[in-house]
């Protein structure tokens, strides 16, 4: 006598709690466990990518590139016999497996609190530049510097509408060098120096990912259309675009303090 399939009770799926009590791990859980032993990971919300460094080290975080993903895949196979794809590893790393970090805010929050009137660091910095009007130089540089930090620490609105401009009669006066060195060493990955296209597609990535943009010797070359586009970029609070290899268009707050000379 034949029996219907419904006559056989379905085997119940074990709960996640039961699986962990029994010490059972999925393949991806084994991958995550081993990666955590070997490396430290974080998701850089400014660059919108995962970064890594050797576990328990104090070295700088490096971006997870295609080469690095393939190296992870190779090491998982050699160390634990885990065979997986680089794409699967990338999917794991671009999830809540890696903690989200805003490196620029992390840097500023870790700085010691100083009394500006007592220490006078801004004044000593200003004295390294010879200008025609020291009073205005101090006023606007201080306003610009405060705006740099305010813009980096807030996602909403644009807190810095001041653009720092250094001009000189001749080349070789170290204007670009001075501006570049305003960027702290730990934040050098967020400094761009060079020429930009105010109406090009790449500019959206620049103002979303870089805190400092040093536009080298470009002010006099801008036509009226590019000049207006640049003014708009400086005061834009956020940009919407699709990053390379992303699926969706997303909104990103703008970061940079643009410098021209």
Question: Can you say where each PLM-predicted feature lies in the sequence?
Answer:
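Conserved catalytic/switch belt of AAA+ P-loop NTPases
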Residues: 227-250
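Short glycine/proline-enriched turns and hinge-like loops at secondary-structure junctions
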Residues: 158, 226, 252-253
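N-terminal nucleic-acid engagement/recognition segments and initiation subdomains in replication
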Residues: 1-117, 135, 139
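P-loop NTPase catalytic core of nucleic-acid-dependent motor ATPases
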Residues: 95-212
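Conserved AAA+/SF3 P-loop NTPase catalytic/coupling segment centered on the Walker-B
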Residues: 211-234
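AAA+/SF3 P-loop NTPase mechanochemical coupling elements
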Residues: 203-208, 243-261
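Short secondary-structure junctions
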Residues: 41-47, 188-190, 237-243
């Amino acid at each position: 006598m034949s029996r219907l399939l419904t006559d056989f009770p379905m085997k119940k799926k074990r709960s996640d709690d039961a699986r962990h009590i029994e010490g059972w791990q999925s393949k991806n859980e084994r991958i995550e466990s081993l990666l955590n032993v070997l490396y430290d990971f974080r998701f850089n919300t400014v660059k919108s990518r995962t970064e890594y460094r050797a576990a328990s080290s104090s070295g700088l975080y490096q971006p997870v590139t295609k080469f690095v993903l393939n190296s992870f895949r190779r090491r998982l196979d050699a160390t634990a016999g885990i065979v997986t794809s680089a794409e699967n590893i990338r999917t794991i790393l671009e999830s809540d497996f890696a903690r989200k970090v805003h490196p620029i805010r992390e840097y500023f929050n870790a700085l010691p609190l100083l009394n500006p009137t007592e220490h006078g660091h801004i004044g000593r910095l200003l004295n390294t530049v010879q200008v025609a009007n020291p009073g205005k130089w101090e006023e606007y540089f201080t306003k610009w510097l405060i705006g740099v930090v305010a813009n980096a620490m807030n996602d909403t609105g644009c807190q810095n509408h001041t653009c720092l401009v250094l001009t000189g009669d001749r080349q070789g006066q170290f204007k670009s060098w001075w501006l570049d060195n305003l960027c702290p060493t730990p934040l050098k990955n967020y400094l761009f120096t060079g020429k930009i296209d105010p109406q090009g597609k790449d500019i959206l990535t620049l103002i979303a990912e870089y805190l400092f943009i040093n536009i080298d010797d470009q002010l006099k070359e801008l036509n009226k259309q590019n000049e207006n586009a640049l003014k708009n970029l400086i005061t834009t609070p956020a940009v919407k675009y699709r990053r390379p290899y992303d699926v969706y268009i997303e909104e990103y707050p703008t970061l940079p303090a643009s410098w021209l000379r």
